[in-house]
């Protein structure tokens, strides 16, 4: 454990000293790993199902949905159970679970009156109250009505200082989504902000005016699992064509994703190269845009950063070079 902390601590501390500017005590941001999809080829006889809004695919889904519902509704307890579950899901007294970020508690809330949902936040002190007062940042139902599109909120990543956020909205609930930059103070989308068209994209702020992102850049830029395999750096004011490639995974990999950690130690930008659903290689993004592979096992699961040192758990026992074996499940 000491060896792992020493190696990573020295490497990251040295790299931070070389360039990234400290961003203050903004909280850690990490990104969820997507589920690996089945590989698709041009010879796949079911490729037409990928067009989820296509007439043939919709008809196929409706036929099977109708059969399934008929079977479920044949149970005499169906309606009773349906009504009971719906009542629980729409209950206004259920716990509003939140995520602590930028010093506030963020929550996404859906009920019978807000079917598409409310993205909102509250101070920690307010959240501790029995009936907290929420500051609604985005009313997705109102956005649907204003733009005439069935948007589904897929999350947001906010810049240091909480001045801008990258909001992901899926048309109709598909895995693919648009990315639109949002001002949480004026509660409006920026006309000249960072935007990405509908795709399976992954985005995060490096600083207030720079993002690391992966998306569908065209033929050959997605993995066989249909996730981005190229991570680029994009500066505000540049056309997307000017974005520089930082890392490129192989087509057979699951994905390549960026994550950024911020704190008094500065800014740590990492890229995970997903080898399988449970294994990844990790690369540190240097200030000049190059990457450095970190000496940690592929089964490591990064949990965060403390005092400039990465914290990760082990899915398997690991013996660092020159060190002793560290047991499976250890926090390193």
Segments (PLM) and residue ranges:
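Beta-propeller folds
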Residues: 8-14, 19-332
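Bacterial N-terminal signal peptides that target proteins for export
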Residues: 1-8
């Amino acid at each position: 454990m000491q060896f792992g902390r020493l190696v990573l601590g020295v490497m990251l501390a040295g790299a931070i000293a070389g360039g990234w500017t400290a961003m203050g005590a903004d909280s850690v941001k990490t990104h969820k790993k997507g589920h690996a999809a089945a590989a698709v080829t041009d010879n796949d006889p079911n490729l037409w199902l990928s067009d989820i809004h296509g007439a043939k695919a919709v008809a196929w889904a409706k036929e099977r949905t109708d059969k399934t519902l008929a079977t479920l509704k044949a149970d005499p307890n169906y309606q009773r159970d349906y009504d009971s579950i719906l009542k629980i899901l729409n209950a206004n007294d259920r716990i509003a679970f939140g995520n602590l970020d930028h010093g506030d508690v963020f929550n996404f809330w859906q009920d019978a009156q807000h079917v598409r949902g409310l993205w909102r936040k509250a101070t920690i002190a307010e959240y501790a109250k029995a009936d907290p007062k929420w500051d609604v940042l985005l009313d997705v139902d109102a956005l649907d009505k204003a733009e005439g599109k069935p948007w589904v909120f897929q999350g947001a990543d906010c810049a240091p200082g909480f001045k801008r956020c990258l909001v992901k909205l899926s048309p109709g609930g598909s895995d693919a989504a648009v990315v639109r930059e949002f001002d949480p103070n004026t509660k409006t989308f920026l006309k000249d902000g960072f935007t990405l068209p509908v795709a399976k994209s992954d985005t995060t702020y490096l600083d207030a005016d720079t993002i690391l992102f992966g998306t569908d850049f065209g033929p050959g830029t997605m993995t066989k699992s249909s996730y981005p395999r190229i991570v680029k750096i994009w500066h505000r004011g540049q056309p997307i064509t000017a974005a520089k490639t930082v890392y490129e995974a192989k087509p057979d990999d699951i994905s390549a994703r960026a994550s950024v950690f911020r704190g008094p130690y500065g800014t740590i930008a990492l890229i995970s190269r997903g080898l399988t659903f449970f294994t990844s290689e990790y690369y540190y993004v240097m200030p000049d845009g190059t990457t450095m592979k970190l000496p940690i096992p592929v089964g490591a699961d990064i949990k965060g950063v403390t005092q400039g040192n990465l914290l990760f758990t082990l899915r398997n026992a690991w013996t660092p070079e020159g060190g002793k074996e560290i047991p499976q499940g250890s926090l390193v």
